[in-house]
Amino acid sequence: MSEIRDDRQYTQTHEWILDHGDGTYTMGITDHAQALLGDMVFVELPNIDDEVSIEDEFCVVESVKAASGVYAPADLQIIKVNKALDDEPELINYSCYDDGWLVKFKSHSVDDLMNVAVYAQILD
């Protein structure tokens, strides 16, 4: 069974979002997603200050099995990227909710996310 954290919200495309309560958010891929993809070998991160429109791909995670896009859950601006993934993309496999986060962003509104109960149902 995949780990799901109850302090986050989730997207249909298996990303997690942590709301810091000040208009900033941290985002990564879920445990379910990293398990399906397998061992990570490369992460293509966006640039700081990039502005991304809702549902646009802005990041790519590559594993030994496949490459997968990461999509914006809202109109957002990148404020920080996890540079540790440049040297250790496998952090996503070992610690997808903590050390393996992808980006931090700011946004005026992040809607249409699933809470832990709803996300758990789509995994069943």
From Swiss-Prot:
Which cofactor(s) are needed, names only? (R)-lipoate
| Record carries keyword Repeat | no
Keywords noted in UniProt: Lipoyl
Query: Which InterPro entries would you find in this protein's record?
Result: Biotin_lipoyl, GCV_H, GCV_H/Fam206, GCV_H_sub, Single_hybrid_motif
- Domain named Lipoyl-binding: which ranges? 24-106
Q: Which residues form the signal peptide?
A: none
| Positions of modified residues (N6-lipoyllysine) | K65
Per the annotation, how and in what number is the cofactor bound? Binds 1 lipoyl cofactor covalently.
Give the GO terms filed under biological process for this record.
glycine decarboxylation via glycine cleavage system
Q: What Pfam families does its record include?
A: GCV_H
Q: Which GO terms describe its cellular component?
A: cytosol; glycine cleavage complex
Domain of life from the UniProt record: Bacteria
Sorted alphabetically, which PROSITE patterns does this protein's record hold? BIOTINYL_LIPOYL (PS50968)
What biological function has been recorded for the protein in this entry?
The glycine cleavage system catalyzes the degradation of glycine. The H protein shuttles the methylamine group of glycine from the P protein to the T protein.
Note the subunit structure: The glycine cleavage system is composed of four proteins: P, T, L and H.
Instruction: Show the HAMAP family listed in the entry.
Output: GcvH
Q: Which family does it belong to?
A: Belongs to the GcvH family.
Name it. Glycine cleavage system H protein
Can you name the source organism?
Ruthia magnifica subsp. Calyptogena magnifica
Q: What is the lineage of its organism?
A: Bacteria, Pseudomonadati, Pseudomonadota, Gammaproteobacteria, Candidatus Pseudothioglobaceae
